[in-house]
Structure formats: structure tokens, C-alpha cells
Amino acid sequence: MSSGANITYASRKRRKPVQKTVKPIPAEGIKSNPSKRHRDRLNTELDRLASLLPFPQDVINKLDKLSVLRLSVSYLRAKSFFDVALKSTPADRNGGQDQCRAQIRDWQDLQEGEFLLQALNGFVLVVTADALVFYASSTIQDYLGFQQSDVIHQSVYELIHTEDRAEFQRQLHWALNPDSAQGVDEAHGPPQAAVYYTPDQLPPENASFMERCFRCRLRCLLDNSSGFLAMNFQGRLKYLHGQNKKGKDGALLPPQLALFAIATPLQPPSILEIRTKNFIFRTKHKLDFTPIGCDAKGQLILGYTEVELCTRGSGYQFIHAADMLHCAESHIRMIKTGESGMTVFRLFAKHSRWRWVQSNARLIYRNGRPDYIIATQRPLTDEEGREHLQKRSTSLPFMFATGEAVLYEISSPFSPIMDPLPIRTKSNTSRKDWAPQSTPSKDSFHPSSLMSALIQQDESIYLCPPSSPAPLDSHFLMGSVSKCGSWQDSFAAAGSEAALKHEQIGHAQDVNLALSGGPSELFPDNKNNDLYNIMRNLGIDFEDIRSMQNEEFFRTDSTAAGEVDFKDIDITDEILTYVQDSLNNSTLMNSACQQQPVTQHLSCMLQERLQLEQQQQLQQPPPQALEPQQQLCQMVCPQQDLGPKHTQINGTFASWNPTPPVSFNCPQQELKHYQLFSSLQGTAQEFPYKPEVDSVPYTQNFAPCNQPLLPEHSKSVQLDFPGRDFEPSLHPTTSNLDFVSCLQVPENQSHGINSQSTMVSPQAYYAGAMSMYQCQPGPQRTPVDQTQYSSEIPGSQAFLSKVQSRGIFNETYSSDLSSIGHAAQTTGHLHHLAEARPLPDITPGGFL
């Protein structure tokens, strides 16, 4: 295998032949050059011969002289083969009486052949024994990018990878063993000499070992990654009749074997590729990319007629604004090198549709100078287009490569932020006189420039599907009368009388027109002239509008309306309030029949408590006698005007919005606020009380404990105790009640519990948050004995050790403590009104 320095592959770089014009014969006898007359006659015959070739006119126009002769010979050879193979009658060949019938049959065969080629996943290839392409179907262009006229009667080795040429030569031999002397010259392609066999030396045509199935890599112009496409060849060796070749001695040679195969891509195409592979179309452009022609497939895909396509002006009007600079770069490359390379961009089709295409443009020369451009486009799917767009964004620095440009979303060539302000001339006499700077318009750009093509495009083609609007468009392009009213409010605050009058003409669209324009000559129609005149009569100029724009841009309507700003909204408040309301609603529905007894019992309990307070007022000073009553009133009826209080539930800060509590009568004395945990050390959080029935959701961090309520009352005292790590109660519980109790010590003892202590009103404590349940006392209260504090009790020792060692904050409690050992002697127990639920007897994680 050669090093590949002199290896050449097939390409499509050929010059267009010179188009000769018929010159009139001079009237006088002017001498002419005989050689020139000979060349003119030869060119005339070649043009006539080229017109007889069965190829489209656009293919014929770019053929050179040698290609015309090559294709003419190939056509004659193919016709001779089919004459023998199809065994057509002389009458049909010479145009006998059945000429009309033959034309109908040929037309039907042609249509059937075209349909078969379109349905075939590949192309037909016939290669002779001397490695010349005898025939290639027109569908070769869909897979390799070569025209049918580019490969016919050319060496097949120019298409095959150098590493696969030996294998292809072996497959051409009938015994898979070509002569070793016939080596493939990798630099020039075909072998130096061909060996011809007689029919006696060749096997029958229908032999099984004449079948072929192999793979090799072919040169592909559509693949930019490697330049080759792996193809699978499947066919058989057959005799090529009708060639009438002669040997060196002049004797007629017998028909030789040739490879008839179908070449298919090794990787099967997807459904979308099968759908789009037959829609490759070509367009013809001037050197400035102005369209001057389009084939039938292009008209079918884009939806334009050739007249509509060629009368619009620059071809950049059909290109997406985000792809213009990318296509312009390929355009410049084509002018410099003659070929643009594969370029992926979006073309605007009819009915407001964008089509991704992969294009390759070539420069066609005439008389040694560039004449026009031929562009070959292949439609792509949207997924393929977006993939190419992502690859392009990594290599190109400007933002237009990513498709995110907003230049095409506004009417002005510049965005409102980038739009240059008119230069005003300040004067003491009038503020209406101003001299604007020259604003860009459609006429200020060159007709063939990119900006001119961009301005000529309709804005609506970029709004379907709607894209994200520019920041200023949401306020000014799509503004409403309500927003104009908000502008008026801002002007009133500034005290501008002229701005107050702006509401009459303050529509957002008019404001946008005023922003993008200048004096009256910039408004071509009468409507905009009237707008400009009204603005001048009201004393409003563009500087005022600019200041109004800036003020409106940084001011939101919600703030002006007095609404709460988003940053002031506590999401946790809303969540906890919703949970609380849901629990309250469900509880009220389940226990509606119990609401009336609850209120009555609470009222009775309060009245009894107040009677005790009146008795104790005779023995204690008024300030001290009034304090426990305030505590009880506060525990029964919490504050109703509390806002959202921040509390910590299970170690997490949250917000809690209390709902209105159940009301009851307390005519004896005015209820006052009681602040539990009023002196916290290291924290400033407040704990609202929850008097609603079953207002606190069920939690695992809850230990039920039931204690009776005793009437005795003593002075309050402050006690330092830890906020965590309480041990569970050692005393037995009597029911599944959702209450807990808290022990108090009298004021005259610093490290012990008073023998006069009783139990305070039951309260539920949750890991930093506290709620109050409404309680029902029994029909009567039975006094019980009081239990003295004993140091031998293990529960008391453990409790006091924690109190002494881990004091976190001070808290004021009532000194009413009940006997722990006589809890079962009470006649009525406090209980929760909601449905009883079994709770696990575990150590709580919070306060007890």
C-alpha cells in the first residue's frame, strides 16, 4: 500500500465551458483564421451533442468538452447493451408502426424505474472488468454527493478508499483470484492491462459462485467527518453484451463479465432520513447570493414559485437572522476558494415555516472569471439542525451563532437600550426645538447588506412560534391602557402637568413609535405625523419619554397597588397556616356536637378559678394575687391579634398563624395577656397559644401524661431548667389523653419542691413550640393529700440534677402542684375532645 502522497480521489471541481455566441457573417470579405473557424465548428458540434444527452439542462450547462465526449460514448455503450439484453425488435428500434405504443411503454417504464430507485435504499452500480463505471443510477448523489455525470465512465478506484481497492479488484475477478501481475496502481487507479477471457474459460452466468457480497468505503462529499461512507455491495457477475470491443489483432472480443450490484449504506437510515433523502434541490444565485433559479424539488419544498423566489432581491432575506453571519462567512470562503463547504442554516419557506437545510455552494466560472453560484441543499430535521447549532455555538464567538439574538424581534435596527438618543439642543426659550442625530433607516443601508436584508424581513416570521420577548417589549410593545394609567400616577408624583396629559395619547404602541423615531420626516404616514404634532403641542419631547420609560421599567405595578412584595412573603407561614386550617376544619366537622359542652365547662372552670383568686386576695398583696389569674386567663384565651409568630418546631424555624379561638363568657374580670417563657436567654422567639380543639397535628415527639387539677394556689416562682433531655415520667398514665404537665417549685426553695405544690393547668409542649388544649373539669373537685418531696425518689433526683446542671432560660410558673402519688383519687380527668388516638410511649424530643 502506498503512503498516500500521490493518491487522488474523485472531485467535482470542473470549469464550466465557454458559451459561444453566434456571430454574424461579415458583409465584406474580411480575412478569418482557419484554425478559429475549425474551433468554432467543433464547439458547435459539441454543444449539439451535449443537448442530446439524457441529462437535465443544469447538468449539461456545466459539462466541459471532455465530459461531453465521455458521456456520449457511455450513453452509446449503454444503449448497445440494452438493445442486446432486452432483445428489442428492429421495428421498435427503427420506429415502425408501433411507435406510439412504444412511447407509452417507455414512459411507463421510466416512471416505474424512478419509483424503484426512490424506494431503494442505495444506488445501482455496474463496473466492468477493467474497473470502469459502466453505469451508476442518479440516486448516487443522495449517498455520495456526486452527480451521475461525474462518475460514469470513470475509474471506480477514484471512489474507493486505498485500503479497500485490492478487495474490490478481487471481487471483480470471477475466481476471486486476479492475476498478481495486475496490481492496482493506487496513484492512478485502474490496472495497467486487462485480461480478456473466452466463453470457454468462464463459468456459466447463473453459477452460484458468481454472486458477490462485500463491503468497502467510498468517497463521500456529504460527510465532513471522515470523507468516506461504508457501503455494502450485493449483486453478481454477469456478461456485458453489445460492447463490440476488439483485441490488439483486430478480432472481435467476446462479452466480458461485469459486476452488477446494489450499493447500500452499511448503517441503515432512520425513518426521517428515508423521508428527506429524495428532497435534495439546487438553486442558482448571483455572486451576491441573489436567487436567479430553482429546480422543481426546491419549489416543492420551499413552496415558492421561481418568480417569487427570484424577485425578492437578496437571498439573505430567506435566511434566519441568527444564521446570517454564519452563512456570510461561508459565502466569503466560497468567493476565496471556490466552494463554501457544508453549511447548516434555516431557510424561510412559504406559510411562515423555517426549514433546516445543509447546503454546499460552488462557484462557477465563465471566461476565467466567476459567473454565478450553484447551491445544493439537503433538508434536515429539526433535531439535526439543533445539533449543528450547538456545535456552531462552541466555535463562533458572536452571539448570533447560538440563535439567541434579539435583533430581529424589534422594528428598529437597534434595541431600545442600544438605540442612540437624538442629540438635543438646549435653549432657554423652548424645549421643543431639538436636532436629532441621523437615525438608521431602510434607505441608509446598502441594498445587498445583511442589515438591509434583516430590515426587509417581516417581524411576524420570528413570532411564530412565539419567542421570549425582550425586557422592554413586555412594557411598551404589548402595553395596555392600565399600564398607561400607572405611568400617569408616576407623572403625578413628579408634579409634571405635561405628563398628566400624556394619558390621552399614552398607548404603548405610540410610545414605541415615538422612541424609535425623530422629527416629522421620520414618520412617513399621516397617522404618525399626527402623533408627532400632538406630542409637540402638549410639550412632550423624547427626553421626557425616555425618563418615563426608565421610571416605569424599574417600578412594578404590584408595588404601586400596595400589594405585598414577593420578598416579604414567608412561604413557611402560608404552609403552616394551610395545615392548621385544614386540621381545624376536619376537627370541627368531626366534633361539632361537642362544641357546646366545651364552652360551658370552660366557663365553669374559669368561674371557679376566679372564686379561688378572690379568696386568695385577702391573704396576698393585689399585684401577686392578680398574677395567677392573668396566667389562667391567658392560657384559656390567648391573644387574638397576634400576627405570624416565628417558632421552632422540631428544631426547624417556622411560622404559625393562630385562628380565632372559641369564645366564652368571663364577665368578672378583663382578660389580659400572659407571656409564657417571657425571659428567654439567647433567643427572642414567642410562642403563641392554640386554644382550638385538636389544632396541633399528631406527632411522634409527644408523651401523654395525665395529672389532676387541684385548687390550692401559692406564689409564683422562677425556675431554671433545661429545654431538652427530659426523662419520661415515672408515674403511670390513666388514659390516652393528649396532655402533659410541668412541675413547679415554690419561691422559698432554691433546689427542692415544696410540699404545698400542686399541678398547674395541663399544657402540651412540642420541641420549642407550645399549644393549649381546652380542658373539661369534673363535676366536683376532691381534695387530695399532698406529697412531700423526698430525695430518695429516683425520678426527682434525676429531674433536679438536670435542673441544676443545665439551666438555659428562666420561666415563671404557678406553684400549684398536685400530689403525684394521688393522681388516681380525682373524680374528673382532663381530656382532649378529639378522637382518641393511641400514642407511642416514647421519650419526647422537646419540652415535657
Swiss-Prot record:
Gene disruption: observed consequences: AHR knockdown in the retina results in reduced electroretinogram responses, thinning of the outer segment, and degeneration of photoreceptors.
Mutation effect (residue 238 to D): Significantly reduces binding affinities of the AHR:ARNT heterodimer to DRE
InterPro entries reported in the protein's UniProt record: AHR/AHRR, AHR_bHLH, bHLH_dom, HLH_DNA-bd_sf, PAC, PAS, PAS-like_dom_sf, PAS_fold
Variant or mutagenesis effect after changing residue 120 to E: Highly disrupts the dimerization ability of AHR. Reduces transcription activity. Impairs interaction with ARNT
Subunit structure, interactors included: Homodimer. Heterodimer; efficient DNA binding requires dimerization with another bHLH protein. Interacts with ARNT; the heterodimer ARNT:AHR binds to core DNA sequence 5'-TGCGTG-3' within the dioxin response element (DRE) of target gene promoters and activates their transcription. Binds MYBBP1A. Interacts with coactivators including SRC-1, RIP140 and NOCA7, and with the corepressor SMRT. Interacts with NEDD8 and IVNS1ABP. Interacts with BMAL1. Interacts with HSP90AB1. Interacts with TIPARP; leading to mono-ADP-ribosylation of AHR and subsequent inhibition of AHR.
Organism encoding this protein: Mus musculus
UniProt protein name: Aryl hydrocarbon receptor
Compartment(s) of residence: Cytoplasm; Nucleus
